[in-house]
Design a protein with these regions (language model features):
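Structural alpha/beta surface segment adjacent to cysteine/selenocysteine redox centers
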Residues: 19-125, 222, 234-235
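Glycine/alanine-rich phosphate-binding loops at beta-alpha junctions
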Residues: 1-2
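C-terminal cap of thioredoxin/glutaredoxin-like
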Residues: 5-7, 13-30, 38, 106-240
Length: 240
């Protein structure tokens, strides 16, 4: 079973949604049968790599509210995050363009580290107040994930993974995503937003009921073997 999660490193609800999904997945009886894939999405593809505003100022400008109102709005997010064991430090966060951070996720995916890199990026931005558009930050995250930071620098200085990021952003829109986080289960069920863990558990159970593996009963329990044709022979002479 496959769960694809579209998110942006800059999105506070995406990190919260990630934790709530993980909590739901932890309660799912068949969690070992679930493949989780983190997909790329950019809330602001035109964001600067060297932002002029901090998070409070950026949101105040975008939504036409005062800085004080912006701080109050973010206080609620800090509380939600804390309830999940996450530490949000908005006062020091640097809201830079996330495109290269998404390229790092794809670099990680190419080396079997997609999920680890996504987690490290969220922590770097929300908790550690790292500048996730800077090469040295991304190289440090790569190293923390057990990847080659010099190979990452070569990749980021080329066109590597650019089309993959753009394609996933476009695909989210094609699937009907109006925002992130956006969860798609087996390309059939979509869950939008940082829902509570029980919502994710419900959709996982529903999907599993539809795709659960076929159970072949053991004929030995009846004392007789069923008659079959194999690839190269039919047991006609053995018919009763």
């Amino acid at each position: 079973m496959k769960v694809e999660i579209w998110s942006d490193i800059m999105c506070p609800f995406c990190y919260i949604g990630k934790r709530r999904f993980e909590a739901g997945l932890a309660q799912f009886a068949h969690q070992d049968e679930v493949e989780v894939i983190y997909r790329s999405f950019q809330l602001d593809a035109n964001a600067s790599k060297d932002p002029e505003h901090d998070v409070y100022g950026l949101v105040a400008s975008k939504y036409g509210v005062s800085r004080e109102q912006s701080i109050q709005m973010h206080a609620g997010l800090v509380q939600q995050a804390a309830e999940l064991g996450l530490e949000y430090n908005f006062e020091h966060a640097i809201p830079a363009n996330s495109f290269d951070a998404h390229r790092l996720i794809h670099f990680g995916a190419a080396h079997g580290k997609r999920t680890e890199v996504a987690e490290l990026l969220f922590k770097a931005y929300f908790t550690d107040s790292k500048h996730i558009a800077k090469m040295e930050t991304l190289k440090g995250i790569a190293a923390d994930a057990g990847l080659d930071p010099e190979a990452l620098e070569v990749a980021l200085n080329s066109d590597a993974y650019k089309q993959e990021v753009l394609a996933e952003c476009a695909e989210a829109n094609q699937l009907g995503a109006n925002g992130v986080p956006f969860f798609v289960v087996n390309r059939k069920y979509a869950v939008s937003g940082a829902q509570q863990s029980d919502v994710f558990l419900d959709v996982l159970n529903k999907s599993w009921e539809e795709v659960k593996p076929l159970i072949i009963l053991d004929p030995s329990s009846s004392g007789k073997d069923g008659q079959v044709c194999t690839d190269d022979a039919c047991g006609i002479g053995e018919a009763e």
